[in-house]
Amino acid sequence: MAQRILVLHGPNLNLLGTREPHIYGSLTLAQIDQGLAALAGQLGVALTSWQSNHEGALVERIQAAAADGTDFIIINAAAYTHTSVAIRDALAAVAIPFIEVHLSNLYKRDSFRQHSYLSDLAIGLITGLGADGYEAALRYAARH
C-alpha cells in the first residue's frame, strides 16, 4: 500500500498568484497542488491536498488524518503558524510526523512572524524556498 501524505494549506493561500507575488511567488495554489500531485505519482505515494481559511476546519482535518491512514503531514499553517495553539495541540494529539513549510523566509519578515507554535513539534522546517519547499518536503516524506 502506498504511503499516504496530506498537504494542508492555511488561510489566504487560496489567493496565491495574486496576493503579494513579490513575497509569495506567482504560482497559484492549484498550480502548486498540480505539481505536487505529479511528483507524488513519480514517487509512488498517495497525496491529498486540502486548504481552509478556518482554524477549526484545519484542526478537524488534522484529527481526521489519525483515522484515515495518513502517514505524514506537510503543513503550511500560514498566519496560524504564529497564533494557533489549537493547531499545535491537534498535531501533537494525532502524533503523525509532519514538516512545516512556508513559501517566504519567516526570518526576513516582521518580528511577529518569526515565532512558530509548530516548529518544535515538526520533523523539520522549510522556509523561504517558495513552492520548491513543498516539493522538498514531499520528497522527504516519501522516503520516511
Curated annotation (Swiss-Prot):
Annotated InterPro entries: DHquinase_II, DHquinase_II_CS, DHquinase_II_sf
Q: Which residues bind substrate?
A: N76, H82, D89, L103, S104, R113
Coiled coil segments of this chain: none
**Active-site residues, record numbering mapped to chain:** Y24 (proton acceptor), H102 (proton donor)
Which of UniProt's keywords are assigned here? Answer: Amino-acid biosynthesis, Aromatic amino acid biosynthesis, Lyase
Pathway(s) = Metabolic intermediate biosynthesis; chorismate biosynthesis; chorismate from D-erythrose 4-phosphate and phosphoenolpyruvate: step 3/7
Q: Which reaction does it catalyse?
A: 3-dehydroquinate = 3-dehydroshikimate + H2O
* Keyword Hydrolase (UniProt): no
One of its Pfam families is DHquinase_II
EC numbers, comma separated: 4.2.1.10
Q: Name one GO molecular function term.
A: 3-dehydroquinate dehydratase activity
Q: Which CDD domains match?
A: DHQase_II
Its domain of life reads: Bacteria
Q: Where is this site: Transition state stabilizer?
A: R19
Is Amino-acid biosynthesis among this UniProt entry's keywords?
yes
What is the main EC category here?
lyase
Give the record's GO biological process terms: amino acid biosynthetic process; aromatic amino acid family biosynthetic process; chorismate biosynthetic process; quinate catabolic process
The UniProt subunit note reads as follows: Homododecamer.
Indicate the family of this protein.
Belongs to the type-II 3-dehydroquinase family.
What biological function has been recorded for the protein in this entry?
Catalyzes a trans-dehydration via an enolate intermediate.
UniProt-recorded name of the protein = 3-dehydroquinate dehydratase
